[in-house]
Amino acid sequence: MHNSPLYAAIDLGSNSFHMLVVREVAGALRTVTKVKRKVRLAAGLDPEFRLSRAAMERGWDCLRLFSEQLQDIPADNIRVVGTATLRLATNVDEFLSEAERVLNHSIEIISGEEEAKTIYEGVSWTSAGEGNRLVIDIGGASTELVIGEHSEAKLLNSLHMGCVTWLNNHFGDGELSEARFKQAIAAAKAVLEKVAEDYRALGWRTCVGASGTVQALQEIMLAQGKSERVTLPKLQELMGQAIACGKLDQLQLEGLAAERLTVFPSGLAILIAIFETLGIESMTLAGGALREGLIYGLLGNNHDCDARDRTADSLINRYQLDKEHAERVRDTAVEAFNQLQPAWRLSKRYGRPILRYAALLHEIGLCIEYKKAPQHAAYIIDNIDMPGFTPAQKKLLSALLFNQRDEFKLEPLEKQGAVTGRQAIRLARILRIALILCMRRTQGTVPRFTLEADEDALTLTLPSGWLDEHYLRASELRFEVERQQKMGWPTRLLEA
């Protein structure tokens, strides 16, 4: 593993410069280094689109930090790109000359279309989703909108608006008033109207955001006890909170990091305009974007599968799990889910996939030790990078693994934000029964079964005589029935 090569992607953005260094491990990327520095290059553009000397100096100083890390990476494994501000700057050659000398590496100024396409590449690798997917990336001086399916981008645009330019244009004096927000939103809508109909006509099933603005929003949502899905009412509520602060230098929102304060109102205004213009219902945070797209472009890997499947396969390989047994538990859990879904109104979109991955990864805690394997499994999931899984999905997965056996621990099931607490508890009940039915660990030993539910009441029916012939599993099922009844959930075990 230690001999696998390093890869690096550097994004010279309009607000921040970012460096990502990774290596490939067990078919997945492992982050080795992430460095971000706020440069605010776009703030250094004058009316003639010339970069100020001060802005260029900030950029060069940042690249001196990056250059040390690049010395250990083969040149063919490095890609450095500049985006919107460097596309606009009329004196870009002056900046690039010194920047390339400092880095000892060439820098590409990519077009807005290529930036949008690469962002989509990064999202398709690191975020799960079926059907058409709308990707939104609000940068410092441009906003990319892409609709695609799997790895194919179908419609893409790079629009001339960003959180730094909108800050300068609409919040430059630091006033956070309703009038200023209305002005900023209206200006963003004017830009969007040129392309909006194309997006509405093509349509999308899921929407993900790939920018610092959306990252900040999710941090705020979680800190304020809300679900991770971004909606227009939540955005409008946050706008109200910002307006109540009055001034940019007095802005305080629970969960908003200090480094994001300055450009948050302008990014929020742009996002509200996008939601209102396109009619977006909800959005979640993407797992990656431009830098990840650059890395996967260097690797040249085929990725026509769910990002979460790649992550699960990587973890199965890395922790040497019994894949055949894991798949048997998965199939049993999904069969149980399908039987109970109508009565329990379980979420096919949000609940079933995470139940599948919980079944596949249920033995991951055994790599530490058996007695506390469920706790170890939850700890691993909580603390490991899992491309394709949102933070709320990871919390649900962790909660299910924590509750796979022994006494129920309800708090993590109720606190996750991917599904309701009641649904999470019901998924845990399903997983526990599936694990017991699969205890023999060999093909053909899982019995036919029927699960029926009436509110919290659950009945498991097995073939006649099966319980007498399978003493261990019968005993474990009876213990499980007792545990679930103890929680106030009527549970029965029958034969027919």
UniProtKB/Swiss-Prot annotation:
Sorted UniProt keywords: Hydrolase
Pfam families: Ppx-GppA (PF02541), Ppx-GppA_III (PF21447)
Keyword Plastid: no
Top-rank taxon, per record: Bacteria
SUPFAM superfamilies: Actin-like ATPase domain, HD-domain/PDEase-like
Record flagged with keyword NADP: no
EC annotation from Swiss-Prot or TrEMBL: 3.6.1.40
MF-aspect GO terms: guanosine-5'-triphosphate,3'-diphosphate diphosphatase activity
GO annotation terms (biological process): guanosine pentaphosphate catabolic process; guanosine tetraphosphate biosynthetic process; nucleobase-containing small molecule interconversion
Catalytic reaction(s) noted: guanosine 3'-diphosphate 5'-triphosphate + H2O = guanosine 3',5'-bis(diphosphate) + phosphate + H(+)
Pathway: Purine metabolism; ppGpp biosynthesis; ppGpp from GTP: step 2/2
Role according to the record: Catalyzes the conversion of pppGpp to ppGpp. Guanosine pentaphosphate (pppGpp) is a cytoplasmic signaling molecule which together with ppGpp controls the 'stringent response', an adaptive process that allows bacteria to respond to amino acid starvation, resulting in the coordinated regulation of numerous cellular activities.
HAMAP family named in the record: GppA (MF_01550)
Protein family according to the UniProt entry: Belongs to the GppA/Ppx family. GppA subfamily.
Name used for this protein in its record: Guanosine-5'-triphosphate,3'-diphosphate pyrophosphatase
